[in-house]
């Protein structure tokens, strides 16, 4: 009777070892397929993308690392070989240039969200401007904009001032920020009398700033956020999974809660 019992124990031990081996194999396989994606993105997307990435990571083995900043410098870094998998810009120009130089895959290009441009003032300001025309008043000293050459928000702001015939009259009052969040900080700290930022940035600032005017849509190029995967990406499949997730219902809910506008037409882009 002792021999069969010993044999049974050996079989149980072998089964346990096999089960443990299978668990370890599956764990290692899952880890092997988990990629860490590097995304360079416009800083105005920081709050929304950070929240979306948490949801994405909870549903995926992939991880996301962000490099936030002004779209111009981020695109320049990519042109110079920065190890990035995907790029989300606050304007089309930067993505156009990356595609022309062969750095980005045009077939992956898509519009993620839209935004609006607003004029904000410090909430605590006394007798602040109430419109774009008011910016010419003597009581208005400094007006903050993003640097038009490198910051899309600054580009849209300058287009607006030019189309409203105010750019020349306001040139001596303008203070340039390195990115749209720096412009927002200037207003929050009451270092300027007004600033031009995205509606989403004004929302982030809460009750520290007040929106006094919205730029007419006809006064500037549409504020689109195009995303694209780079041709040098080391995790192209994972990057595509993340870009696809950005157009999912959970991601859309987060974008809307942050004040972004969803595209109403086709999201894929084909540009000359």
What are these regions, as identified by a protein language model?
Residues 34-68, 72-82, 87-92, 96-105, ...:
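Exported/periplasmic ABC-transporter solute-binding proteins
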Residues 2-20:
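Bacterial N-terminal signal peptides that target proteins for export
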Residues 17-29:
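Bacterial N-terminal signal peptides
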């Amino acid at each position: 009777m002792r021999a069969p019992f010993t044999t049974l124990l050996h079989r149980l031990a072998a089964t346990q070892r096999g089960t443990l081996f299978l668990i370890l194999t599956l764990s290692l396989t899952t880890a092997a397929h988990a990629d860490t994606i590097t995304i360079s993105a416009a800083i105005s997307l920081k709050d929304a993308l950070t929240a979306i990435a948490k949801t994405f990571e909870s549903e995926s083995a992939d991880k996301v690392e962000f490099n936030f900043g002004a779209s111009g410098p981020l695109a320049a870094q990519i042109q110079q070989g920065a190890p990035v998998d995907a790029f989300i810009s606050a304007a089309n120009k930067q993505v156009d240039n990356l595609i022309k130089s062969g750095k980005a895959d045009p077939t992956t290009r898509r519009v993620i969200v839209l935004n609006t441009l607003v004029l904000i003032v410090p909430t605590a300001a006394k007798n602040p401007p109430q419109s774009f025309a008011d910016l010419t008043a003597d009581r208005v000293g400094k007006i903050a904009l993003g640097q038009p050459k490198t910051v899309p928000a600054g580009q849209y702001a300058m287009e607006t001032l030019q189309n409203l015939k105010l750019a020349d009259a306001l040139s001596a009052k303008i203070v340039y920020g390195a990115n749209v969040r720096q412009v927002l900080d200037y207003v929050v700290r009451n270092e300027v009398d007004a600033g031009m930022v995205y509606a989403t940035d004004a929302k982030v600032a809460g009750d520290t700033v007040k929106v006094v005017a919205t730029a007419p849509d006809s006064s500037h190029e549409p504020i689109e956020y195009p995303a694209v995967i780079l041709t040098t990406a080391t995790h192209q499949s994972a990057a595509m999974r993340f870009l696809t997730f950005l157009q999912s219902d959970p991601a859309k809910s987060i974008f809307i809660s942050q004040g972004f506008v969803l595209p109403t037409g086709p999201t894929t882009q084909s540009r000359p």
